[in-house]
């Protein structure tokens, strides 16, 4: 692979600088540490990247904006929607480092959309389409959009050659120009062989660490879930590794064996707590990634999620800003779980609530008082009939109970299947809240 020296140097400088002065984390605790504009108080808007459904409204993927401020007259209502003019399996999105733009991708058509959410977050504008991913990289299915200084790091799920799970990461600048690509390793590193699969991305600048996880390719995620689970060969085509990369050089340094499709990655955010946690979809386990006494990264399963024998299918997770708690959604049984992470070596489930017939994404406010859930996983994996609920549900959390705040029925409102959420605040209020560093 050809390495761009200028890119490496920029990564080096960014990483070195941010070890000493890390930019603020934003509202949802899964966002990049390089993002500016921390919302410490009440978020004003929730943006939902939504899958289009044939015959429902205009049938297009769209960005839906909901008023989330209880002081507003339109609290809990859809106040804006912008369609992209087609269906490409809308899935995830991420802010640029300046928090002014949202990049959102389609897992099927690999189109990337850039929305201006900084000028007027109540009415985002679609300003750019990027359709060069497959041609420039050979990857398809852009999943994770992770801000770096002046750059967007994109983790993909599949490849254009055979639509399998071998894939990689790509880097674009904030203007939408392609910069570089990095294949997921398939070689053996430190006695563990890579499977080449990809999914999530998460960075710990203080440890010069970039951690990736693994899922499955287009052939599986665009196929009916019932068919996949009944096909023994298809079930072999899920990721079983995580990769620790050197953030400065963007080279893989260690492969961790984590069987069962490790999905979302969440680093502990308080200074000095240099560990990460993930959940495996197929085996329903929480896994801790942490250095041992020798300074070598290790991954170990530390807790079961629900009853693994019933395959509840853990999907999204959200860590609290103090790293003492973790929300976990299990899709098949529609349950939202809360784990006490006071001892990350031994997480304890202390609360659970049935929140829908199916539930997928979870986002929480920085103070942990508000929790938002959406229902859709993938268009071909969602349930059918009466169990095909499509919603955003907002809750208040007092440390003991989730209390409903408001709900949007996306089917009734002819919007589609809601997936990923991001928060914004009005520019005037956001400006007064910036400048606060996590560390």
PLM-predicted stretches and their roles:
Residues 29-37, 58, 85-97, 135-150, ...:
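Beta-rich, blade/repeat-based domains predominating
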Residues 66-73, 114-124, 171, 175-177, ...:
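Short loop/turn segments immediately following beta-strands, especially the blade-tip
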Residues 78-84, 127-135, 178-191, 251-256, ...:
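A short beta-strand motif characteristic of beta-propeller blades
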Residues 96, 191-339:
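Beta-propeller domains
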Residues 118-205:
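Asp-box/WD-like beta-propeller blade repeats and closely related beta-sheet repeat scaffolds
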């Amino acid at each position: 692979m050809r390495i761009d020296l200028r890119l490496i140097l920029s990564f080096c400088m960014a990483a070195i600088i941010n070890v000493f002065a890390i930019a603020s984390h934003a509202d949802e605790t899964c966002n990049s540490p390089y993002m500016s504009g921390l919302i410490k108080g009440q978020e004003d808007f929730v943006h939902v990247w939504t899958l289009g459904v044939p015959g429902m409204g205009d049938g297009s993927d769209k960005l839906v904006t909901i008023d989330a401020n209880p002081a507003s007259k339109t609290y809990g209502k859809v106040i804006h929607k912008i369609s992209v003019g087609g269906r490409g399996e809308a899935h995830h999105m991420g802010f640029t480092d300046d928090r002014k733009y949202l990049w959102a991708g389609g897992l099927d058509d690999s189109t990337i959309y850039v929305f201006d959410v900084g000028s007027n977050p109540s009415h985002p504008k679609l300003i750019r389409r990027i359709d060069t991913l497959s041609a420039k990289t050979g990857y398809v299915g852009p999943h994770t959009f992770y801000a770096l200084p002046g750059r967007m790091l994109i983790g993909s799920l599949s490849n254009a050659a055979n639509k399998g799970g071998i894939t990689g990461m790509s880097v674009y600048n904030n203007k939408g120009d392609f910069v570089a690509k990095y294949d997921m390793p398939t070689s053996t590193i430190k006695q563990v062989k890579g499977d080449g699969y990809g999914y999530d991305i998460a960075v710990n600048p203080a440890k010069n660490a970039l951690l990736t996880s693994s899922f499955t390719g287009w052939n599986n995620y665009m196929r009916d879930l019932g068919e996949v689970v009944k096909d023994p060969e298809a079930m072999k085509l899920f990721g079983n590794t995580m990769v620790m990369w050197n953030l400065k050089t963007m080279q893989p340094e260690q492969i961790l064996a984590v069987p069962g499709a490790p999905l979302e990655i969440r680093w502990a955010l308080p200074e000095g707590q240099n560990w990460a946690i993930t959940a495996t979809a197929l085996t329903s386990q929480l896994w801790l990634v942490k250095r041992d006494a020798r300074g070598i990264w290790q991954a170990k399963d530390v807790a079961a999620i629900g009853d693994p024998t019933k395959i509840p299918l853990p999907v999204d997770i959200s860590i609290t800003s103090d790293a003492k708690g973790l929300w976990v959604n299990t899709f098949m049984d529609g349950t939202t779980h809360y784990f006490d992470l006071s001892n990350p070596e031994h997480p304890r489930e202390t609360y659970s609530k049935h929140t829908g017939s199916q539930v997928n994404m979870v986002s929480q406010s920085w103070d942990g008082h508000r929790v938002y859930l959406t229902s859709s996983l993938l268009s071909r994996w969602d349930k059918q009939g009466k169990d095909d609920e499509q919603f955003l549900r907002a809750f208040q959390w007092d440390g003991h109970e989730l209390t409903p705040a408001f709900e949007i029925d996306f089917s009734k409102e002819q919007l589609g299947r809601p997936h990923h959420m991001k928060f914004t605040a009005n520019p005037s209020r956001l400006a007064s809240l910036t400048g606060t560093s996590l560390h």
